[in-house]
């Protein structure tokens, strides 16, 4: 059964051009699914998997304390995999059809207030190459709203400071052009002229943002730095790698930006994904009203 999972992972990597994070999620979910089938249900052939087996696996996830969102992701991975097996004629049926996970209320993204963003962006000290790099990364994330995975994949050739935009590749390697403001452009220019060469050392790399080995910085490396910077900035809120992306979208909408324009900048295929930020702005307005209105 492991061979078919390997074939599927190769397919999504080569033919569908999915991001590394998505591929890792697929592989992790399917290994967990396969292990449960073989060790708990004693199913050793994909042709013998039934709808009941999948439902039992989803119940196992729930009983293990997994969230509805996690179960939904596992089911999406399982569906894609069984569709692949059917298409490749490994199996003659898709047992995942018509299986639904329990609908869960979508949590509102956590965002920073403007003064918190400013504290965060002002924290990196421009006394070392790492300070210039961290400043440039944070300014870029807040200025563009791009995903952390998109930022770390940026090449030097993707940055067009004189024209005020960057080129990035989103989910499914979909290309998009995103404008950047003066503050971010200035921070990137300073990083490239004063710091990147020192981080590069004797290595050869076209990656824009480098680690201390002169190689492309990893998502985990950025996340570790972000937590450290947030602590220094005195930010008490729980942060995620997407916090600046969420703040970017929310602050744009609060200041009257068009929803479709924000959708395009974020690279959302479906505008309903972008609409979650309109709920965030309404919630924030209610909080302000309750806090400051004398008769709230």
From Swiss-Prot:
<dbReference type="GO" id="GO:0048476">
    <property type="term" value="C:Holliday junction resolvase complex"/>
</dbReference>
<dbReference type="GO" id="GO:0071139">
    <property type="term" value="P:resolution of DNA recombination intermediates"/>
</dbReference>
<dbReference type="InterPro" id="IPR011010">
    <property type="entry name" value="DNA_brk_join_enz"/>
</dbReference>
<dbReference type="InterPro" id="IPR044068">
    <property type="entry name" value="CB"/>
</dbReference>
<dbReference type="GO" id="GO:0051301">
    <property type="term" value="P:cell division"/>
</dbReference>
<keyword id="KW-0229">DNA integration</keyword>
<dbReference type="InterPro" id="IPR050090">
    <property type="entry name" value="Tyrosine_recombinase_XerCD"/>
</dbReference>
<feature type="domain" description="Core-binding (CB)">
    <location>
        <begin position="1"/>
        <end position="86"/>
    </location>
</feature>
<dbReference type="GO" id="GO:0007059">
    <property type="term" value="P:chromosome segregation"/>
</dbReference>
<feature type="active site">
    <location>
        <position position="171"/>
    </location>
</feature>
<keyword id="KW-0132">Cell division</keyword>
<dbReference type="Pfam" id="PF02899">
    <property type="entry name" value="Phage_int_SAM_1"/>
</dbReference>
<comment type="similarity">
    <text>Belongs to the 'phage' integrase family. XerD subfamily.</text>
</comment>
<feature type="domain" description="Tyr recombinase">
    <location>
        <begin position="107"/>
        <end position="290"/>
    </location>
</feature>
<dbReference type="Pfam" id="PF00589">
    <property type="entry name" value="Phage_integrase"/>
</dbReference>
<keyword id="KW-0159">Chromosome partition</keyword>
<keyword id="KW-0131">Cell cycle</keyword>
<dbReference type="InterPro" id="IPR004107">
    <property type="entry name" value="Integrase_SAM-like_N"/>
</dbReference>
<feature type="active site" description="O-(3'-phospho-DNA)-tyrosine intermediate">
    <location>
        <position position="277"/>
    </location>
</feature>
<feature type="active site">
    <location>
        <position position="242"/>
    </location>
</feature>
<feature type="active site">
    <location>
        <position position="245"/>
    </location>
</feature>
<feature type="active site">
    <location>
        <position position="268"/>
    </location>
</feature>
<dbReference type="InterPro" id="IPR013762">
    <property type="entry name" value="Integrase-like_cat_sf"/>
</dbReference>
<keyword id="KW-0238">DNA-binding</keyword>
<dbReference type="GO" id="GO:0009037">
    <property type="term" value="F:tyrosine-based site-specific recombinase activity"/>
</dbReference>
<dbReference type="InterPro" id="IPR002104">
    <property type="entry name" value="Integrase_catalytic"/>
</dbReference>
<keyword id="KW-0233">DNA recombination</keyword>
<dbReference type="InterPro" id="IPR023009">
    <property type="entry name" value="Tyrosine_recombinase_XerC/XerD"/>
</dbReference>
<protein>
    <recommendedName>
        <fullName>Tyrosine recombinase XerD</fullName>
    </recommendedName>
</protein>
<comment type="function">
    <text>Site-specific tyrosine recombinase, which acts by catalyzing the cutting and rejoining of the recombining DNA molecules. The XerC-XerD complex is essential to convert dimers of the bacterial chromosome into monomers to permit their segregation at cell division. It also contributes to the segregational stability of plasmids.</text>
</comment>
<dbReference type="GO" id="GO:0006310">
    <property type="term" value="P:DNA recombination"/>
</dbReference>
<dbReference type="GO" id="GO:0006313">
    <property type="term" value="P:DNA transposition"/>
</dbReference>
<feature type="active site">
    <location>
        <position position="147"/>
    </location>
</feature>
<dbReference type="InterPro" id="IPR011932">
    <property type="entry name" value="Recomb_XerD"/>
</dbReference>
<comment type="subunit">
    <text>Forms a cyclic heterotetrameric complex composed of two molecules of XerC and two molecules of XerD.</text>
</comment>
<dbReference type="GO" id="GO:0003677">
    <property type="term" value="F:DNA binding"/>
</dbReference>
<dbReference type="GO" id="GO:0005737">
    <property type="term" value="C:cytoplasm"/>
</dbReference>
<dbReference type="InterPro" id="IPR010998">
    <property type="entry name" value="Integrase_recombinase_N"/>
</dbReference>
<keyword id="KW-0963">Cytoplasm</keyword>
């Amino acid at each position: 059964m492991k061979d078919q999972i390997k074939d599927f992972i190769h397919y999504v990597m080569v033919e569908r051009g999915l991001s590394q994070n998505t591929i890792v999620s697929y592989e992790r979910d399917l290994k967990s699914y396969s292990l449960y089938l073989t060790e708990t249900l004693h199913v050793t052939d994909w042709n013998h998997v039934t709808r009941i087996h999948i439902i039992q696996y989803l119940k196992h996830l729930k009983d293990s304390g997994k969230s509805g969102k996690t179960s939904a992701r596992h089911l999406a991975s399982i569906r894609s995999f069984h569709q692949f097996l059917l298409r490749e004629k490994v199996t003659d049926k898709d047992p995942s059809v018509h299986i639904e996970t329990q609908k869960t209320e979508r949590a509102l993204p956590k965002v920073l207030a403007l003064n918190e963003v400013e504290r965060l962006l002002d924290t990196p000290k421009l006394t070392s190459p790492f300070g210039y790099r961290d400043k440039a990364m944070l300014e870029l994330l807040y200025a563009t709203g791009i995903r952390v995975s998109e930022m770390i994949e940026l090449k030097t050739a993707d940055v067009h400071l004189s024209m005020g935009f960057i080129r990035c590749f989103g989910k499914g390697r979909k290309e998009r052009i995103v404008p950047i403001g003066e503050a971010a452009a200035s921070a990137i220019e300073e990083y490239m002229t004063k710091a990147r060469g020192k981080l590069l050392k004797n290595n050869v790399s076209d990656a824009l943002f480098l680690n201390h080995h002169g190689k492309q910085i990893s998502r985990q490396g950025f996340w570790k730095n972000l937590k450290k910077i947030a602590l220094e900035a005195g930010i008490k809120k729980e942060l995620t790698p997407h916090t600046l992306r969420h703040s970017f979208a929310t602050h744009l909408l609060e200041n009257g930006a068009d929803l479709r324009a924000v959708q395009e900048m974020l690279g959302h295929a479906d505008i309903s994904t972008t609409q979650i930020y309109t709920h965030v702005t309404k919630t924030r307005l209610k909080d302000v009203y309750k806090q400051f209105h004398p008769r709230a």
